A protein has these predicted regions:
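Glycine-rich and polybasic anion-binding loops at the starts of cofactor/ligand-binding domains
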Residues: 3-225
């Protein structure tokens, strides 16, 4: 969860003191007191699809994962509720120096300072109430760094599934494409339809260096309140 990235208490206070935005979708029926902000899946993150539990794997396979990975992707991450359950990147892409990992692992590795420097600098907790909430309770998400001059010719993809009724999903995607580099990143989100309110309040921050190119595509199929 949102550890090691600034003053969580301060962001929570900002959330408590701000009014609900008067723009965007209707949030009638959403009672934040009833939203569970963290739901841990019944597995740790795996690097092999065969090791993902069958019930979770079945959900993603109906949506074309990992078939898409085998055919046309440089790497795939799959998040189930609040944490990633699968993450893998092609060896030839990793050998180019491309970093594609989950946010928690990025915070523990050699790119931790880079994550801290860029986290919630484009989307600030003071932007609106749900940005502050995201900063306080975020979990999961992807970190991507493409070094100078590196061109990733096939896309990377992260997929987020919110499956628990009454839950919120607060993944954070942070992509840094350095000078002269090139990347296409695809992100997908989905959730089943429930008769209770769910909340999706993820955050995406994209940093593109001089003469670099980033194409970011998002595909969503959400039957819930999306901020």
């Amino acid at each position: 969860m949102s550890r090691g990235l600034g003053d969580v208490y301060k962001r929570q206070q900002i959330y408590n003191n701000m009014k609900v935005p008067d723009w965007g979708p209707s949030i009638e029926g959403l009672n934040m007191d009833n939203i569970v902000t963290y739901v841990r899946p019944n597995t740790n993150m795996k690097a092999k699809w065969s090791e993902v539990p069958e019930d979770i794997k079945d959900t993603f396979e109906k949506l074309g994962i990992p078939q898409a990975e085998r055919k046309s992707l440089a790497g795939v991450g799959a998040q189930y509720d609040s944490e990633l359950v699968y993450h893998n990147v092609r060896q030839e892409v990793a050998e180019m120096g491309v970093v594609y990992t989950d946010m928690e692992s990025a915070l523990k590795g050699e790119y931790a300072d880079m994550v801290r420097t860029h986290f919630m600098k484009l989307v600030k907790p003071t932007d609106h109430k749900f940005a502050a909430l995201h900063g306080a309770v975020w979990s999961g998400g992807s970190f991507v760094y493409v070094p100078k001059g590196v061109s990733v010719e096939i896309p990377l993809q992260s997929y987020f599934r919110l499956n628990a009724p009454g839950a919120g999903q607060f993944e954070h995607t942070l992509i840094i494409v350095d000078e002269g580099a090139d990347l296409h990143f695809i992100e997908g989100c989905s959730a089943p339809k429930y008769n209770v309110a769910n909340l999706h309040a993820g955050c995406v921050e994209l940093f593109v260096g001089k003469n670099a190119k980033l194409r970011y595509s998002t595909i969503e199929n959400l039957s819930l309140i999306h901020i």
